[in-house]
Every structure is written in structure tokens, then in C-alpha cells.
Amino acid sequence: MQAMDPASRGFYEEDGKDLDFYDFEPLPTLPEDEENVSLADILSLRDRGLSEQEAWAVCLECSLSMRSVAHAAIFQTLCITPDTLAFNTSGNVCFMEQLSDDPEGAFVPPEFDLTGNTFEAHIYSLGATLKAALEYVPEPELEPKLSTDLEGLLSQMQAEDPRERPDLASIIALCEEKMQPVSSCRLCRSLSAIGRRVLSIESFGAFQELSENTWRGRPAPRNVGPKKMPGDLSTDPEALFPSKGLLQPPASRDAEQEAGQRPRAPSPKPLLSAPVRNGENPGQEGLADLVLDARCPLGELDRDNLRRSRLKKAQTFPRLLQESTETSTLCLSLNGSRNQLAISEFFPPDPRKLFLEGKNGLSGFKTQSKSRLWPEQEPGVQLDKTPGAGRNPHRSPGASGQLEASSPSQGSVEYKPSPSPVDAGDSDHEGHIPRSEEKIPEESRQPGSTATEQSLSLKDLLSKLGRPFREYELWALCLSCLSTLQTHKEHPAHLCLDNVLVAEDGTVFFGPPPANGAYNSLFLAPEVSEEKLVTEKASVYCVAAVLWTAAKFSVPRDHKLALPRRLKTLLLDMARRHASERPSAAEAIKVCSSYLLQRGMDSSKILAHLRASTCKVHPEEETIGLQNAFSVVELKSTTAPAPESSPGFLQVSNDTKLVAVPGPVPGLPPCCKEACELPAAFTSEATHFKPIVLAQDASVTRDQLALPSESNEKPKEGSGHLDREGTRKQAALELVEATDLKMSNQLSPGPELQGATPDPDGDSGSPSSATECSCPHGPALVTQQKGTSGTPSSPASSLPPEHRPDGEGPLGTTVLPGPTSASQGSRHPCKPPRGKAAASPSSPRGSDGHPEKPRPADRKLCPSSVDTSSPPKMTACPSLQEAMRLIQEEFAFDGYMDNGLEALIMGEYIYALKDLTFATFCGAISEKFCDLYWDEQLLKNLFKVVNGPASPSESTSEEPGSQPEHSPSRCSLSSKRPSLHGLGKEKPATTWGSGGPCSPTALSDIDSDTLSQGNFEVGFRSQKSIKVTREQQPEAEVGGQPGPSQDSTSHASDTVARLARSEDGGPAGSPGASDFQNCSPGWSSAFYEADCFGADVYNYVKDLERQKTNGHTELEAQSPELEQQLMIEKRNYRKTLKFYQKLLQKEKRNKGSEVRTMLSKLRGQLDEMKSKVQFLSLVKKYLQVMYAERWGLEPCALPVIVNIAAAPCDTLDFSPLDESSSLIFYNVNKHPGSGRQKKARILQAGTPLGLMAYLYSSDAFLEGYVQQFLYTFRYFCTPHDFLHFLLDRISSTLSRAHQDPTSTFTKIYRRSLCVLQAWVEDCYTVDFIRNAGLLGQLEDFISSKILPLDGTAEHLLALLEVGTERRADSASRGADLEDPKEAEEDTRPFNALCKRFSEDGITRKSFSWRLPRGNGLVLPHHKERQYTIASALPKPCFFEDFYGPYAKASEKGPYFLTEYSTNQLFTQLTLLQQELFQKCHPVHFLNSRALGVMDKSAAIPKASSSESLSAKTCSLFLPNYVQDKYLLQLLRNADDVSTWVAAEIVTSHTSKLQVNLLSKFLLIAKSCYEQRNFATAMQILGGLEHLAVRQSPAWRILPAKIAEVMEELKAVEVFLKSDSLCLMEGRRFRAQPTLPSAHLLAMHIQQLETGGFTMTNGAHRWSKLRNIAKVASQVHAFQENPYTFSPDPKLQAHLKQRIARFSGADVSILAADNRANFHQIPGEKHSRKIQDKLRRMKATFQ
């Protein structure tokens, strides 16, 4: 097993010669998330940290790896963390760029901002990573004991000064010394194996641990695998497989443990090393299958092709590494006709799929050879002796041939006793009810049942699909399986790909287990294999195995499956070895539902679409492509091929025979000259060995590209639609002859001749739908259709890969039936699409148009290959198609652009640049697609094409409803859309002067969901946003089928979003701004982002819409109703509150039980009324935000924003976009929130110009971006720069905004005003009051420029004039309940009384907090337990009676404090603190390090030192920005209060008075933190912890109960330091006012500011700025709910006077002057007198 036999070597050596034409380059060092397992994964999977020996090994290997990457690009961008330190399958250390998230501050060296990445910086990060890995323990008592050497090394590596850190050489030397007896490589290999071994589902590559993990307990069936040892390949097909011994689990548990302890047994090493690797074949599910495949040549060829296809993309588009690898793993194909023959003779990829390929997809001799090979060469393997193969035909080699001889759709009935297909008609009616077990086998044995009438098993579905399930498909499958599982009374013990059945409507149900009782141990839970009771969680385990197999389908086994973390975590949890650790079905359903709900997806629709895409084709008459991306593009009318022009081929007759002609085909003039000629691509020498794609009708393509999986079309309805389409065949035929001479190189809607009649070559060879991607070295095909005069036509339409039938085919590339296709053999592997132009489409979301169902060329339904769209709608855009042709002719090489999506998107983008100057045109293209070389001649040709004679007529803006249903549409607009209502308003690209090539909404869907799902995307790319046009186009329904994405979750958000966008655009001077004068989204927008407004708000607004009788959905129409209801609720609240106050006074006098009962009821009513008022205020805020969202642009239109100032008066300018205007996005799985749809990608980074332009993006207000920007923009631009940017946009669009209210100019103008108003409202005190020049400039601009043309801007000018007063008023209003005066009058007693008379203590319940482990804090009174507020804090009491009655203090000195109650002092101190806090702004807490604020109380800057900062202090703001230093005033005040507290105590002349004051301050502090005044509480704690106070003898006589408060204060301080958002958790911060500690909040923000703000390309990390904005937004959150205590001016004056008196005093000197601060030494009775005399004598001598 260790070495490959000579025959095998010879086979691979010979096979390798066929691959020599490839230019091999070294693979990327770090294919991120592909083969690597990170240290974080290892730690979390095995649930313990590294041992000391492992730490030495990892340190050594990392140091060596670090030295090897010193000159690599990753060295400058790497930050070593547990997530970026990874191990590949060989155990080698790898570094991965974790671009999707900022590293934690603990791993970033302190000097990083100044020095960047250096060896010293990486050593610091490595030390921090190792420290974290060593301390990763689930329980405190398991903390490791480290040796002195290791502890010292880690400490040195994490030294603050880089010069004190050891160098690499010394680290390596020390590690090698410590690793003398062991091999560090072996230990790291063991760690790598652990990361893969812990999860049995994921441990495909670790064969030695085959049965020692989760799957342990059931031996593999003896006859599952071949019985012979590897031998001569020419005589023994089993030589392709490992021996049977590998399949057997260890004989005993001891053997299992021994195998588990070995790092990795040597025997499977050859399986993991090239060229013999674990290539997994389609349809294989079991671990045994995976071992059988270990020496499969097909797997190796696929993997080599895979790596070649991944190579170019990984290097050219590093931002899409993750997508590239994931996509390319789905692109398995064969190379070369010779190789294909050899492969087919040695090992079938999948018998079921192979039969289809042999019959319909590949040549006939393949089927014959494979059918003949296995039964003859392996007679010993009988069907009745292969129980393990009952569901996996490929498991037994002998079975494959017999399977091919049986029913083509089902395989052998004997071989598969209980197949999966079920009658689809019944399943439609049954819904989610599982079919009875008796009926399934009976129906499935009907050989005549077709795919359209049966359900499919997952194995059939995957085989026909030819690729693994994508992420959202896995979520849908998981939800459907679990939902079906809940309906079962008896939980199935065994689920696999064969008995998980998918009905036509997407319903999943479970078939019976194998009739012979054979189970694959992969799909058995450990407890089931041990013959324990089958529980629900055992079935959950089976579902996880099924999902993992579906996700791993056709992925090479030595590649780590790249799944998103959220999905992977769920699968791992579901596959836990112990049932108790697995989630229940309900819990897993909740996770799946939240994911799908966020994206507006429906699981049944997704699965129904998948099933429809594979089941509508009759296998006998329709061909299925090889695998994944080379799927079928349905044969549209006059479909043309997309071949190379190697030897030229011309069709000489109307059949499919092709005749070669010597040399290139003579070319005719270009198609744009309206002549019938052959495109130059077929005749150009430059296109030899290049796939040529003729662009299809973009009007149809656009709809299908954006086809949503969750479309509301039912499959059966779609079938009816197909039939209706089929009836138009004759009309299409007539249209062909009428249009073919007029439309050159564009689509002629008519049936395809080859598709109209079945032809024998198409059945035995490769028919039209077999594969579209031409082989790089294969012959070119040119098909001429009868009656078209040689005009080649591209496919009429095509679908995104996952939406196309039988796989994913590239756009516009269809190889017509003919023997040549079969002789081509292999196809070039699919390359991942370009990062900027396109990515593998995988979105289930759709465009605004009608979503067409995928329709293969099903000759039974539609003998003419189903014309996809009606004949009158087939007008194409010649300019766009010619542009695509030029692009492909230039760049389609080595498989690039094989699938046509790249060319389509690039062509549409370029087409959008029409009407620009040539220089601007060239600059925009070069910047957008900067990774390609654009020849000047090519740019000239493209410029000529897009600005050709046909352009002006197409560039005119279409008015709503101007386009008839059957009139020819522009190339970019869906021809399926019968109406274009609202097009100009909601699709800004259509008003780009050029008319825009596409619907921006659809383009947005494509860009975000289907074309750029890579990890990173640079440039202005579209994101998924609420598509408001979907429900505005009910006439887009065809046959009663509604438009896409109207499920329960998306419906609410779409409805609400629709309110914000008028149907007719509204007048230019829309009065909405005057009705909704508050444009600021508020702190909640920055903090909660998309979750700011919950589903209740959406539903309420939707109800408002339904109540409108006049049909208006304008915001202005909603406002009066809402305002009226809000006013009524406020009035009721005030009346009830006044009645409550009267009853309260009566209760005080009478103390009657009846009054008390009524008071209790009234309290509940008041709470309910207050909640209602707050809710209505939130709805009002939402409508205000949606007014701003009304003017949002799709991100694809954002380049207009960047250089709009230079645009001519009638067009929008696409000036060259350089690095200064880029944005970077990344994919995330956002956590479930309010149910609102969220974006698939969020902004990761951007340059200042790009970030400012992104303010104009749709949903920028709703998603919180605007508010976060307003908090943080000073890090990258000054207020003057920002104002200049806004005013430029306003001035550039002002004159044009009033010409067309629906234009993009209007949207830019209105959004600019909204952003400007939000800025003024939110940051007036920060940016405008202190900067008179900025304020004057804005006022002058509004007065002189805006007001003469737009009177609605008057409110903005008024806002500037009363800015200060308005800001102060809004801050003092509690929850916006009423007018300020009424609020002060009414809410104050309500809040106070509710707090005082709350018997259940709701308002006094303390926040949840804890002491973090290992913080070193020792609590003397509560060592044995962890602090909680409930346990640490007794019931609140103010001790009013304990300290005597209230007395007016007139004398000075500490005695006056004892004359006031604790509550009086607490309330007045709170009001004093609140007065200061209300004046601060979140921006004041930013960049505090530059102000000298340090993480020590002693370092709080004094008044004298605050102005002179250290030279080392470097500001994070721009140098010319003058920062407001109000934070220093807050901190100085806090320091003064602490000093006052300490001074009052140490200046008390008696111990008794000191005890009284200590008690007083402790009880005040206790009241403070109970009432959430953490600022004063921490200030008092600071005073009490002063050294002079702590040394006071009064502590010794302080009552124990009072002394405990000190420990509680310390615990609260620890809690406040633990989490930057701890005060925002729970309901208390909403119900009660809060005053945070300014110093601690500044420290939290400082911690977030640690690390680099900019990336290597100069872009600012928006993810970091977003987190800072969230923390800073707490300031405004707490200011919204102020305390309503009654002020006591006299007491406040006394407190201010005492605090000012001790401000800046030295407490130690004050303490030294007071003898009460010294401990009395016991002695003789005269000792005190002697001491007094000595003191007096000393005074006389001085």
C-alpha cells in the first residue's frame, strides 16, 4: 500500500503526457479555507488548549514558516491569530489572510500603527496566539502549568518594546532544543489530523481514523470493497482501489484508541500525495466509497484540472480566493478525448450518471466499454452479496455495468430494491406528508415513469445536477429534512441520499430503509450503530451526514470543504458523537429558518427549483452534461455554438454533420453594419484555441440571470407555462424568416432545427445540451440554420449555473448535436469567474421581471426545444452583443470566460458608458477591470460599438408605462416585463443619459447574489438591497404567477420600502422634507443597524398602507394619521399620569387597600401607554428614515457620485475611477435579527471618497451606515472636506434635479440634502458651533444657491439658526413622549413614583454581570462564589431614617454631608453628573489617546498638563482637524469628585466622623450603581481607593455590611471593564436612565482603536470604524433617557462648592495634617498627651 505498483505508475505517467500543454504554475501557498484547518478550529473541536510540547512545536514550525514568507506579499498583510495560523493536510504550518474580519486587539502589536508588519510584530502576534492557545481551557481548574522557559519566551515575545523581543534565530534555536526527542513536524501533523479527525463527517481524508470517531461502532460490510490487493491494472480493475483491509475498523476499542493516538498512520500517506489522491466521484456518500475511490484516475484528473482552473483565478483575483476555490471545486471535467476513453474504461464517475452520458452525453463506445468492463473483470462481486451497495451503485464495480443495462432513469431494480422516485403528482397534493413505504417501491419500479412524474432521491438529484449543493441549497435541504423529521412518529434510524426524496413541489420526505437491511455506517449515529434506541437526535445525525455528503459531492477528498462558518458549525453540532450534545430538530430548524428568513428564501421553492431543473428532461431524449458548470443551456430558437475557430467548420447541410474547411473561415464585415455575415470571431486567427461566445438577448438573459429560487412560481404552474410557450412555436418559425436577414449576430426567435427533430447522432453522441465549453484544443463548430443565410445566433437566453437544467452552463455557449462534440471528449475545466465582472451565480433572489422556470429542451413538452420567450419579445441589442464579442475575442483564453457570464456583465457595464468622451470611457473601463490589459484599438472598437447608430434611440429615457407588453424592449430590460412602471424612479441606471444597459435592480441582484460571492469585492459593486419594484409590478405576473420574493419575510420589508418610493416619483419639490424634518437616523441606527426597526414596525406600517382608501402609499399620506394617533396617545398618557398622581397622594393619606389596588392597575396601564407612545415614535422615526431611503441609489450607480461635478448638463459622468474611490465588500452570514432581509455582503473597507459616495447607496440610512459614518468620518476626512463633497454634489445636480423628478440627479440632490440635514442634526455641536467658518459657508450656500431654486431647504437653514437650542431640547426630552415642558412636568413624577412604589423590584433589578476568570481580583467576603447583582446587592434602601431627618446645611465642612440623606445626596450628585454628560457627544470619546487619556486613574490629565501632550502621542484624526476636548472636562470633573470624596474623609477630625462619611459615600455609590449612575459610583470608588483613605483606621471599625459595599463596587468596576456594550444589554437601559463612566467608555473605544485603520491599498477599515461607532453610540442612547429627579439648587451649590474647594488638592498632604488618619499605638495612658506635647513643641520650632 505504501508504493504504487508499476502499472499504476505507468498509467499516470502516460496520462500526464496529455496534460503537458498546460502551463503549470506553483499553487498558491494558502488556498484559504480549502485544505487548511486553523488553530482555532482545532482548539474548539477538541475543546482544550495546546499542551506545552505542542506549543513548542507550533512555535518552531511557525518561526520557520515566517522566515520562508519574509519576501512574500502575505508578510505585509498577515496578522497571526488562531484563525490565520493553520495546518494543511500534511501538517505543515500555513498562514491565511483573514481579510473578512479585523484581528482582535490582543494579537496586534502596539507599534503596528507606526511600523506596520515586521518580524518583531509577527513575533508579538505569534506569542499572543500561542498564549491564547495554551490558555484555551473550558474550566478554570484546568488551567495549564507552563514551564519557566516557555513562560519566559512568551513574555519576551509579547514585550511592549519591539527591541526587547527575541529574534527568529534565537526562537528557533530554543524551540529546537526543547524539541530534541520529538519531531515538531509530526506533532503539527497530529494537530492537523485532530482537526480533521474530531468530526467524523469531515474526516474523509484521515483513513486511519475511519472507524474511531463518530461513525465508530459498525464494521464496514465485507463485500463493499474489492477483495484483491492492487495488481496489474490491465487485468485487475481492483488495482484502482486500496485493499479491503483499509475498510475494516480496528478490531477492538483498544485498537481504536491506539489508532486515535497516532498522529497519522503512514499507510494512508500515498492516498494524500499526488498523483493518487482521494478524488471523490459524483454520487458517492459513504466512507467506504471514499476509500474505494482513493486510486481513481478520474479523481486525480479532476483534481489536476481543478487546481489548474483554480490557479489563474487565485492569483489574478486574490479577493475572490474563497469563491474561486469553492466554485472551482464544482467544476470537474475531463481533459482530452484520449483521456476520456481511458478513464471510462477504468472507472466510471457514477454509474447512474455515466449511463446518461454514455447514452446521450458522450460517445456510444464509452457505454459499451464500461458496460463490458466491470462484469467481466470482477465476476466475484454479486449484487446479492453487496448489502452496503444497496444505495450506492458505485460502491461495487460490478454493479455499474448492470446498472447501465437497466432503466436509464432508475438503474437496476434488483440492484436498488427501494429506489427513490415517487409520483410527483401525488407529492404535489400531499405536501409535506411522507409517502407510505409500501407505495414507494411499487411506483419506483415502473420503468416507464418519467422524470416529470416522479420524485427524485438526493442521489439522483446530485447526479443529474452534477455539482454539490450550494450554501443556501444546503440550508433549504436541512430545513426541509428536519421539518419532515418532526412529522414522523417514528424517527428513521438510517437516512442517506437514496431514501431522502424530493417531490416536485420541493417537499422532502423519507423513503424506507434498504430492503436487505444493509446500512452505510456513515449515515448511522453512533448510538444506533451500538443498537441503542433510535431518538430524534439520531435522525438529526443522519440529516447532518446527508447534508455533508451533498456538500462534499464531487469535491476532491484531500481538499477541505469550504463551508461558511455558520453552516459548518451547525453541521458539526448536529454530528456530535454524544446525542446530548446535538441540537434537537426544533433548535436546528430555528437556525435554518433564521438564515432563510434573513434572505427571503423559501426552502421548498429552492428544492422545487432544483428538482425542476433536473427532472423536466426525459433521460431517453435529453442529454445531461458532464458536471457542474458545463451544464445545459436550453436550446433556444436559432441557437448558435460557441466554439473555437481552430480548423474552420461550416455546416454544409441542414443536418448536424460538420465539414472541415482548410484555414479560417472568410470573415464578413462586423455585425453592427446590419449585414448578414459571419462574426469576425470565427475567422480571426487570434481566436484560435479560444472559446467564442455569441451574446444572447440580454433582455431575456437579465431576467433569467436573476432568477430567484424562491420564486413564487409553482413547478406545476411552470410546466403549464412551458406548454403555453410551446404553442408559440409556429409563430417563432415565421418570425425567423422575417428577422434573420435583419438581425446579424443577435437572437432570432425561432426553433432550432436540430432540436426540432430527434437525431441519432444526438442520442449516441454529444447532443446540443451536453456541454457548452469547447475544449481549448478541440475543433470549432459553426452551425448554420436553415433559412438564416449563415447568420449565427447565440442562445436566446440562459440561466445562472445553478438555475439551468442538469447543471450550470455558461451563457451563450451551446455545442450543437453532432459526432464532433463526442470526439472532443474532455472539456476544459470551468474557471471561476472574474472578481469584478462576475462570479458563479448562486443567488436565489430574482430581478424585477418575471422569473422564468428553467426549461431544458424537452422534446415531449416542446419539440422545438422550447422557445424561452414569446416571438414579439426577441429584439436584441446589437451593440451589446458586439461589445461582448469583442471582449471574448480579446480575453477568452485558456478557459477564461468560458461560461459567458463575465462577458455579459463586462459588456453591460461598457454599454452603460455610452455617450461619454473617449478618454472618460477608456478610464472607466481600465479602472473597473484593472486586472486585464485593454488595448487602445480594442477600446476604440468598443467605443465605436456602444456609440453606434443604434445607440441614440435606445438612450432615451422611457416613461412609465410607455412600453407595450409585446413591444421590443431595450437589450437590458427584461422582455418578459409587460410594464415598466416606476422604472425611472427605482432604477437609476436607466437615467444615466445613455439609458443604461440593464435594470440596475436586476444588476444589483446579479452582482451581489450571483456574480460576486467571493470573499472580497473591490469597486462599486451592488449589494443585495430591498427591491422595491417587485410589488409595484403586479402586471409582471404571467399566468397568475406572482413575481419573486414575496414570501412572508420579504413581503413586509418590501411593502414598507415601497412606501418610501412613490409610484410616479413625486414632484421635484416634494413636501416630504417639511413633514419629516428629522433626517438623522439616530443612535439606534448605528447600534442596531438593520435590526433597529423590528417586524412590528414593518407590520404596523403595512397596516397603515392597507387602511388607505385612496391608494396612496406616499410617506406624506401616512404622516397625518401617525401624527394624530401619536398625539392622542400622548394626551391619554398625560391624563392617566395625572390621575395616578392624585391617587398616590390619596393613598399616602388613607393607606387604603382599594387605592393601592387601583394604583397597581394604573401602573400597568402607564407602562403600556408609555410603550405604545415609544412604539409610535419609532414608527415615525422609521417613516422619516424611509423618506431619506426614497432617494437611495443602487450601488452599481455609485460611480456617478464620485465625479458627478464634472458631468455635462445632460448626462452623468463615468470619469476614470482610481484607487481613491474604491470600496471593498466581503461575504458574511449575519445573525438573525428582526426578520428583515439583510445584505449578503457588507462593507469591509473603502477610501475616503468611496466611503462618502457610499452614503448615497440604497439602505445606507436604514442599515445604519449614515449614522456610523457621521460618528467616525473624522478618522479619514475633515468636516470641511465632507461639507465640500456634499455641496459639490448639490451644486452639480441642483439645476437638473427639478427637470425630471425621477432622474438620478434628483436622487443625488435629495439624498445630499438628507445627509446634510442628518449631519447638522446630529453633529451640530461638534462640527458647526466650534467652526464658524464652516457654519457660515453652509448658510451662505443654502441662502444663495439652494433657496432660489428649492424652497423646501428653508427648514435646513432654520435648523442651523436654532441648532444649539434644538440640540439641548432634544437631549432633555425623555423618549420623545411629549413637549419638553410637559415632559419635565409629567414624566418626572411618573418615573420617580414607579421606581419608588415598584413592589416587585423590576426597576431595581440589577444588570447581569460577572467576574471574568483569571482577572486576579480577590473578593474577601465572597471568595467562594461569583458575583451577581442579585446576590451581591441587597434590596435597595436609602437609609433616610437611619441618618436623621432632613436639615438645611449652612455650615461648611464635612459635617454638612451627615445632615443630608443618602437619597438626597445621590439624586443631586446624579443631576450634577447628568448636566455634564448631556453636553457631550459620541465624537468626544474618539481619539482620546491623543488627548492624553491613559488607562490609569493617575494619568487622567490635569488642567495644567492637558494641553501639553507627549511627543509620542499620535492623533488618529487628520492632522488639520482640531479636536474638541470636552472629554477632558468630563474626566477632570470625575477626578475632582474622587478627590473631594477622599478629602472629605481624610479631613474629618474624628474616627467616628470618618466612619459616618465612609458609610455615607458607600451607600451613595450603592444607590448610584443600582440606579445605573455608574459615573458617580466609579468616581466615589476612585476616591475611596486612594491610598490615604485606604490607610485610614476607620475601615477597621466600619460595619461589615457597609464594608461589603466596597467589594460590590469593585465587582461593578470589573463588570464595566469586561465588555464595551455591557450597559446596552437587556431591558434596563431602555427602562431606566444610565450614566456611564466616561473614563471606562473612553478606554473601551481606545481598545477598538488599537491596530491599523488602513489597509495596504490605502483603504480605511470600515469594519473597525463600524465597531467604534456602535460603542460610541451609547452616549446618545443614554442621553435620550435622562433622570427626572427634582433638583435642589441649594444642595447642588454646596456640593459644587465643596468639590471646587478640593479640586487639584493633594489628598496625602491633607491626610498627614489630620491625626485621625493615623492608627493609635496602644501604650500607657499618658502616651497620647506626650504625643500632643511633642507636636506642639515641633510647631513652635518651625
From Swiss-Prot:
The keyword Repeat applies. Signal peptide: none annotated. Residues 426-445, 711-727, 847-861 have a biased composition (Basic and acidic residues). GO terms for biological process: cerebellar granule cell differentiation; regulation of dendrite development; regulation of dendrite morphogenesis; small GTPase-mediated signal transduction. Residues 215-288, 365-455, 703-727, 744-876, 948-1006, 1028-1076 are annotated as: Disordered. Residues 1461-1712 form the Ras-GEF domain. One of its GO terms (cellular component) is guanyl-nucleotide exchange factor complex. InterPro entries: Kinase-like_dom_sf (IPR011009), KIND_dom (IPR011019), KNDC1 (IPR029899), Ras-like_Gua-exchang_fac_N (IPR000651), Ras_GEF_dom_sf (IPR023578), RASGEF_cat_dom (IPR001895), RASGEF_cat_dom_sf (IPR036964). The modification Phosphoserine is found at S267, S951. Highly expressed in the brain and at low levels in the ovary. In the brain it is most prominently expressed in the cerebellum where it is restricted to the granular Purkinje cell layer. CDD domains: REM. Residues 403-412, 782-791, 1043-1053 have a biased composition (Polar residues). One of its GO terms (molecular function) is guanyl-nucleotide exchange factor activity. It is found in: Cell projection, Dendrite; Perikaryon. The keyword Repeat applies. Keywords: Cell projection, Coiled coil, Guanine-nucleotide releasing factor, Phosphoprotein, Repeat. Residues 1239-1367 form the N-terminal Ras-GEF domain. Residues 755-771, 949-965 have a biased composition (Low complexity). Residues 1112-1177 form a coiled coil. Interacts (via KIND2) with MAP2; the interaction enhances MAP2 phosphorylation and localizes KNDC1 to dendrites. This is Kinase non-catalytic C-lobe domain-containing protein 1.
